[in-house]
Amino acid sequence: MSALDAAEAALAALHPRPYPLPLGRLAPVVEGAFQGFGRTGWVVCGPRERVGATLRGCPVERLVLAASGARPYKLAPCSEAPGNRALHAVGLALASREAVLCLLGTASAASGAFYEACNVAGITGAPVIFVVTVLPLDDRAPVGPQLAGAPAALASACGLAAHTVAPGEIAAAVSSARASARPTLIQVNLE
């Protein structure tokens, strides 16, 4: 059992709120993103991805309430609107003048707030790193396609560095993006 699996099991036993959200196929994305980003700098993510903060030394007890941050570990509180996370990350990057990691999914990228965040990051050069996970949709999905194009294409159009990587390449891509100190979107396609 990996450290992330153990942390996820410990968090589930504490009955996190709003409700337990298992990582499932997102585990390598979360692990790679947190490992590549390191222990310093703010992280903005959803309730599901918060367990990655344990890789920074955050105790699982600090992760029970998704709406609460874990300040000593630079984990921002979760926004109820997924797309707003991108705006919060850009704001944190501009205010701190340090790299900020933001974990998003397709629903976040389909939000107008995501476009606004990419636009502001492109204009200002905010050192934000968006990691956007794209899952394939089949007939069992509760919704149809949410994006007309790829998140990496939208980010590139806004002036961000944009890369599409496999799950095993996330840590290196995040580390490289952090070293570049420029706004970057890393798209991860899960098959």
Pin down the residues of each PLM region.
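Generic recognition of stable, solvent-exposed alpha-helical segments in well-folded globular domains
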Residues: 2, 28, 116, 168-172
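Thiamine diphosphate
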Residues: 128-191
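Cofactor-binding active-site loop characterized by glycine-rich and histidine/acidic residues
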Residues: 16-125, 145-159
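A generic alpha-helix structural signal
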Residues: 7-11, 33-34, 118, 174-177
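Short amphipathic alpha-helical segments, especially helix-boundary/capping motifs
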Residues: 10-11, 66-69, 129-131
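Cofactor-/ligand-binding subdomain signature composed of acidic, glycine-rich
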Residues: 1-23
